[in-house]
Amino acid sequence: MQYAPAQFTSVSKTYGSIKALNDFDLTIQRGELVALLGSNGAGKTTAVRILLGLSRPTAGQIALFGSDPREAASRSRLGAVLQSARVPETLRVREHIHLFSSYYPAPLPMAQILEIAGLEGIERRKYGELSGGQQKRVLFALAICGNPDLLVLDEPTVGLDVTARRGLWKQIRAFVELGRSVLLTTHYLAEAEALADRVVVIDRGRAVATGTPAEIRGDAASLEDAFVELIAV
């Protein structure tokens, strides 16, 4: 039986009196890129932490390939780039990729990782010598070393200029074209519109709308206008 890469079923998460997720539902299908779109504090990072097994839901169920996210078998099929990701600045790009690849039984070939992540030509440079956009692409490369079936990207383009952001978009789409699934959290509406097969708008811990970017936009003048209307309800 084939299970969806990720499934949240009526998931809630409370921290004291704060409800970070509130009866949250989301299923990510194979081969699709889902953008979880919301303002700061909407619950995006909480959802990611629960999916990665770093936090447990207060109520509801979370499944990663049909299993508990804490199980090694399901985690081995997952890659992630978190906002807090840090790697040593003195290692070269190739050295980082070689090290991370050694953790997996069947990693992607070095050449393929460099090509997908757009790192060809800078693989011998030290991480600390790279621009912010290049460093983000290295973190993306490390997340795909294990050839994951599901990639989780938590606000991957925060702090990047427009050129670097669009460059990373290209690398993300290249990975999806391999038939993989991606969960992307973002508060950039242009990012969701450019990348996503499906957008889930989250507000105060609850999914308030889901659909293609065009469906979310509806009759509004722009996706931004539709988003503002949705979170104002």
PLM region descriptions:
Residues 60-74:
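Conserved ABC transporter NBD signature motif
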Residues 98, 102, 107-123:
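Conserved ABC ATPase "signature" region
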Residues 151-155:
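Catalytic Walker B motif of ABC-type/P-loop ATPase nucleotide-binding domains
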Residues 210-211:
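ABC ATPase "signature
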Residues 126-130:
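Conserved ABC ATPase signature
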